[in-house]
Amino acid sequence: MPRILVIDDEQLLRSTVVTILTRAEFSVEEASDGRAGIAMFHKNPPDIVLTDIFMPNRDGIEIIKELKHSSPRTKIIAMTGGGHLRMMEIAAAAQVLGADHVLDKPFDSESLLAAINAVLGSLPPPKNQVGA
């Protein structure tokens, strides 16, 4: 089962995303800011990181830079709100840095799950374990 780390400082949005992903039978962990999210990532790297862009204690752009530098194969979905033009600028910056997908807030559960499934389709197959 793919593991997802959700990093967002907005508690209500984070809880909603965690609920949607848990109901879809994903294993989910959550962090309330960038610093906590990076620490959780390094402790137990997930398959996918779903991160807000605008947060205290390390924003999403910093998270994308660090995680792609330390773990280039990590799949990252960036979430952001804002005006349309601003969203396009942020999406372009996030993708240049290595985000695999960008979700514009607010989004519905179908859009969230479609983004997760699109990113899952690009995950490498699991390594075969000898003797398993």
Give the positions of each predicted feature.
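Short amphipathic alpha-helix used as the core "switch/output" element in two-component signaling
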Residues: 39, 61-73
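Hydrophobic/aromatic residues positioned on beta-strands within the core alpha/beta folds
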Residues: 79-81
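Two-component/phosphorelay signaling modules centered on CheY-like receiver
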Residues: 11-29
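Alpha4 helix (beta4-alpha4-beta5 surface) of REC/receiver domains from two-component response regulators
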Residues: 62, 83-103, 110, 114
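Receiver (REC) domain active-site loop signature in two-component systems and cognate sites
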Residues: 55
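Acidic catalytic/metal-coordinating carboxylates
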Residues: 32-36, 59-62
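Active-site beta3 strand of CheY-like receiver
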Residues: 44-50
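Active-site residues of response regulator receiver
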Residues: 8, 52
